[in-house]
C-alpha cells in the first residue's frame, strides 16, 4: 500500500512537470510594461472627439507582455431607433458585445481549423471535394478547376470564387438565390469561378462559407456548437457566441448596427429583408438570410475581454492557462506569408507591405497579423513586440452618407476613427 501511494505521488508529480501551462492575462499599468501613460491616454480625448462627431462607439483593449494595459469604452451601444436619435441612448461599456463581422473568419473558423490541423483531423493540402461531395466543375463552367481546389487555396483566397455573390438577394443572385442553409451549400457548389485558381488573390466570403461547411463535415457538429464547446468554453469565455439572442443574451448587452435593417436607408430591397434597427442579430446578409446566423465568414459576437484571451492564445503559441488548442508550429503555419502576396497568410491578414498601413499602421512589426470586420472591428497581433490590440465598433449604426451614390458608406465611415491604423499608431507611439 505504501509503495503504491509513493508511486502514485511520483507519477502525479512527473505528469504535472510535463503539463503545459501557458501565460494568462493580468492587468498592469501602462508604465509597468514600457508605455508612457501620458502619451497613451491622449487617445482618450481624440476618440471622444470622434464620438462627438458621430462615430457610434469604440471599445479598445491593449495587451503588452501578457498584461492588459488599457481597456475602455466610448460612445453608445445604441443611439438610434430607425432614423430617430434616442432621448436616452444606451452607453457602451467594456462588457458590450459586438458583431465581429469578418473577424469571425479568424476567431471561429481559423481557430477551429488550426485545432483540427494540430489534431491531425485535416490537412490543408486536402482537396475540398474530400469533405464536400459534389464539389466539382459544372457543365458549362467557363473556368475550370474546382475539382483540384485544396483547402490551402481557399485559405489563401486564391480559389477563384467571387467576393460577394449575394445569395439572399434574388435580384442579384439569380439562379444562385438562397435564403436557407439547406440550399446554400448547393448554390455555393454551383457558383462559377471568376478567375483561374491560383492566378491572384481575391478576398472572398464564399471561401470561408466553404470552410465552415468543411468544419461541420469533419466534426459532425454545427459550427457554432463546435467552437463554443471545444474552444470558447474551455477558455472560460462567457460572451463569445453566434446568435446571442437565442443563447440567453438580451439586446441591451449588444451593440446595435444598421438603422433600417439591411436596406441601406431604404435603397435596397429583396424578399424578407429586415427593416428594423439591427440589435443582436448578425448584420451580414449572407450569414443571416442564407446561413441562419451561423457561417464561417460572419456571425460571431464577442466583447474585448474574450477577444483578448483569443489573441493571447495566438501570442502564447496555441494555448491559455492549462488549455492547449494547437501548437506554435500550427500558429507559424497559418500566419506565414503567402509567396504570391505577402499580405495573406492562411486566412490571417499579414502586415506584409504598405497596403496594410490602414489596418496595422506604420509602427507595428512586419510580422504582425490579424483581421478586420465590416462592422468596425480590428484585431492586431504582434509577436515581435508581444502586443495585441482589439478595436470593436458598430460603425453601421449611423445614417448612410449618400444612399443613391454608394449605399455602403455610412456617415461614421467618413470619420478618421474608421481608419484603424491611426489608432494603432498612437498606441505604438506611446511606447518608451
UniProtKB/Swiss-Prot annotation:
It is a single-pass membrane protein. GO terms for molecular function: serine-type D-Ala-D-Ala carboxypeptidase activity. Its EC number is 3.4.16.4. It comes from Salmonella typhi. InterPro entries: Beta-lactam-related (IPR001466), Beta-lactam/transpept-like (IPR012338), Diverse_Enzym_Activities (IPR050789), Pept_S12_YfeW/YbbE-like (IPR022849). It comes from the Bacteria. Belongs to the peptidase S12 family. YfeW subfamily. The lineage of its organism: Bacteria, Pseudomonadati, Pseudomonadota, Gammaproteobacteria, Enterobacterales. One of its GO terms (biological process) is proteolysis. HAMAP family: S12_YfeW. The chain crosses the membrane at residues 7-25. One of its GO terms (cellular component) is plasma membrane. This is Putative D-alanyl-D-alanine carboxypeptidase. It is found in: Cell inner membrane. It catalyses: Preferential cleavage: (Ac)2-L-Lys-D-Ala-|-D-Ala. Also transpeptidation of peptidyl-alanyl moieties that are N-acyl substituents of D-alanine. Keywords: Carboxypeptidase, Cell inner membrane, Cell membrane, Hydrolase, Membrane, Protease, Transmembrane, Transmembrane helix.
